Amino acid sequence: MSMIMNLLRISKQELENYIQTPSLFEEKLDVLYESEDNDDTFLDIDKAWGGILYLLTGSAFASGSPEDEVDSLNRIFFSAQFFDEDMDVGYGPAHYLTPEQVAGIHRKIASLTEADLKAHYDPEAMSEEEELYPSLDWDEEDFDYLYFHFQALQSFFATAASRGEAIVTFLS
């Protein structure tokens, strides 16, 4: 099985509803999975999340903490903010970013270029990093895969930030 990173844009009101009643988020996922025509509120970045996280933070696995600044890239996929920490939506619980955190992260990633990311791309070091997902022998061609999904991520965050939306992330 592969661990696929999924992102879902939601309104501030939906965020508050899911925090108050986590089962509503499970219902949302059921509807999302049953729909054959997902709209632009849903993004699947496949297995690129580990490599993207490495390029952004220098770490194979980073997660947020309450002490992090609002725009910390450590929390881009794993904010450690849960509707219900015991709710398993695939590979663990869903994490969420508040609209303020989304805006802060957007400001940090919006101007990153291919050259910026390429400067942090070290296939040899990435291949040796045991916690980096997926575990593979990274090479120069793999950068294109990461950059393709990073561009989709940039656009997704830009839309969410411009609309004052929250983002939910989860592995399936």
Give the positions of each predicted feature.
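A hydrophobic membrane-anchoring alpha-helix module
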Residues: 159-160, 165-166
